[in-house]
A protein has these predicted regions:
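Boundary at the C-terminal end of the N-terminal hydrophobic targeting segment
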Residues: 17-19
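Active-site beta->alpha N-cap acidic-glycine motif
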Residues: 21-146, 151, 272, 279-281, ...
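N-terminal signal peptide c-region/cleavage motif recognized by signal peptidases
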Residues: 12-14
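Positively charged n-region of N-terminal signal peptides that target proteins for export
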Residues: 1-4
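Catalytic domains of cell-wall/extracellular-matrix polysaccharide-remodeling enzymes
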Residues: 88-89, 111-267
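Low-complexity, Gly/Ser/Thr/Pro-rich intrinsically disordered linker/tail segments
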Residues: 252-292
Length: 292
């Protein structure tokens, strides 16, 4: 899905910044608390370590291709699923994710822009998605003890009547009895969702995140019909992070075909793929379980 709100792709956090865990803090969040770039994974910068994440699935065609590539490379990823996409046809893909050592997490029930819906609607949909994910873990025969959530479009905090982080804490207290839900953004957007992206360009972007150089991002334009769309634009990366959390989508052909190329590049350049819960900022520090 279009990440039209996430306009900054590389974090500028100092390597000396203190790592912290991305649970909502025990305070009241206000409208000044927004902007996803403050929530990266600086512990990975300059390490050559990357955490792969895939949003918006499961997809009946593209998700299996990505799982095949990950299995061949013995690499683990995190899949932020839309639980409305899970049905009898796609549930086996969720089970396969878990059986093969990946993390399954919530990206919501549907791909709503959090800033455009009321408090009641947003809370109900996010809560449902987490309950859905818990049920999927149970059905697949796995323990649900890693609670991650990713805001669609990285959109949060722009409502005047409520703040999403405060509601996320409410949901967690109601479902687990503690502040347990990690919110997970990213350091590098692969741009796989931009119209016209090829697998080769997705690979080139990954290389730029490690080595610097040309990077394909996007700009939003209006068509003659008055609709908005995104087109590719090229920028230079002069100071690459050389590590971080990577955003991809398992509903995109460019990622389904490009992930093998990325994993080959990782292997040939002595880089490392780590799972999200191995990253300092996203480690599980609480013994949380869903209430019975």
């Amino acid at each position: 899905m279009f990440k039209t709100i996430a306009t900054i792709f590389f974090m500028t956090l100092s390597l000396s910044a203190l790592a912290y865990f991305h649970y909502p803090e025990d305070r009241n969040y206000t409208s000044n608390d927004r902007g996803y770039t403050q929530y990266g994974a600086p512990s990975l910068y300059k390490t050559g370590k990357y955490a792969l994440t895939f949003d918006d699935g499961p997809h009946p065609i593209y998700t299996p291709k990505i799982l095949d590539a990950l299995k061949l490379a013995n690499a683990k990823a995190t899949f932020f699923i839309l639980t409305s996409n899970v049905n009898e046809k796609t549930f086996p893909l969720v089970k396969r994710m878990l059986d093969e050592g990946h993390i399954v997490a919530s990206h919501g029930y549907t791909h709503d822009n959090s800033n455009t819906v009321t408090r009641e609607v947003w809370k109900a949909r996010v809560k449902k998605s987490i309950i859905d994910v818990a049920a999927l873990y149970k059905r697949a025969g796995h323990s649900f003890d890693k609670f991650y959530y990713r805001f669609p479009y990285a959109a949060y905090g722009q409502r005047s009547d409520y703040h999403h982080m405060n509601v996320l804490k409410e949901i967690s207290q109601e479902l687990m009895g503690d502040n347990c839900i990690h919110f997970a953004f990213w350091d590098f957007d692969s741009s796989d969702w931009v119209p016209g992206m090829t697998p080769e360009e997705v690979l080139s972007n990954f290389k730029a995140s490690n080595e610097g150089g040309k990077y394909i991002t996007y700009k939003t334009i209006k068509t003659k019909a008055g609709k908005t769309t995104q087109i590719k634009v090229r920028k230079d990366i002069s100071s690459p992070n050389s590590g971080g959390v990577v955003l991809e989508h398992d509903i995109q052909h460019s990622s389904a075909e490009g992930i093998t190329k990325i994993l080959e590049y990782v292997a040939s350049n002595n880089l490392e793929i780590v799972r999200l819960d191995e990253v300092e900022e996203f480690k599980i520090t609480k013994n949380c379980r869903m209430k019975e």
